[in-house]
A protein has these predicted regions:
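N-terminal beta1-alpha1 cap of cysteine-dependent amidohydrolase-like domains
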Residues: 1-65, 71-77, 183, 187, ...
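A structural micro-motif
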Residues: 3, 30-32, 80, 102, ...
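Glycine-/small-residue-rich active-site loops that bind phosphorylated ligands and cofactors
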Residues: 13, 92, 180
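Short polar/acidic secondary-structure junctions
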Residues: 26, 96-97, 130, 146
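Amide-donor transfer/coupling interface in amidating biosynthetic enzymes
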Residues: 113-196
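Cysteine-nucleophile active-site neighborhood
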Residues: 56-128
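Redox-cofactor binding/interface segments in oxidoreductases and associated redox assembly factors
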Residues: 50-51, 84, 173
Length: 196
């Protein structure tokens, strides 16, 4: 089976996410065709969506201007999986605590932006993530913190604060799972649901 994975390709680690999705698919004997999303009309044909990091205000503006935001909401309402990382999580949230961000409101969380510091304060930490065997090497770069959680399920915490959640078909992380050689977060977000 070949799954079509769409990556919102405004900013962020697009090629790294593509490699992680393809690795996760390959580990299950499947294939993933990766397409970049910069305009409307692509999301409806995707089985999986990735919303990478970058600058949340820039991502939000593109999603609104190109009319991609309603397509992402429809994708989620159809129960199709999404992985939103770092700034992608900020945009996907119910409340980004930033008037410049038009939230998609597909993850019932409130965000505190850049809570883990500036770029120079970046770090890697082993996380126990619900659904994964063994710690995940999470890379935090100017990472947001999930300040409060509504109906979402907390999948991982760092120092007592949520950093990974699942809300229906959406998995959101404060960290960058694509910056490791470990594709288990992509597998957890996508293939456990898409192949079920």
């Amino acid at each position: 089976m070949t799954l079509r994975a769409g990556i919102v390709a405004v900013q962020g680690d697009v090629s790294e996410h593509a490699a992680a999705v393809q690795s996760a698919a390959g580990a299950r004997g499947e294939t993933a065709e990766v397409v970049e999303i910069r305009q409307s009309g692509i999301v409806p044909d995707c089985d999986l969506l990735l919303m990478p990091g970058g600058e949340s205000t820039t991502i939000s503006r593109l999603l609104q201007r190109e009319r991609i935001a309603p397509e992402i909401r429809a994708h989620v309402e159809a129960g199709k999986p999404v992985l939103a990382t770092c700034a992608g999580l900020i945009v996907a949230s119910a409340d980004a605590n930033d008037d410049r961000v038009a939230e998609l409101d597909v993850v019932d969380v409130t965000i505190e932006r850049n809570a883990f510091g500036r770029q120079k304060d970046s770090f890697e930490a082993p996380l126990d993530v619900a659904g994964l065997d063994g710690p995940f090497p999470a890379v935090f770069i100017r990472a947001p913190v999930i300040a409060s959680v509504g109906d979402a399920e907390v999948l991982a915490e760092w120092e007592g604060r949520p950093v990974a959640v699942r809300d229906g078909p959406v998995v959101g992380t404060s960290f960058h799972p694509e910056l490791t050689d470990d594709s288990r977060i992509h597998d957890l977000a996508f293939f456990e649901q898409a192949l079920a």
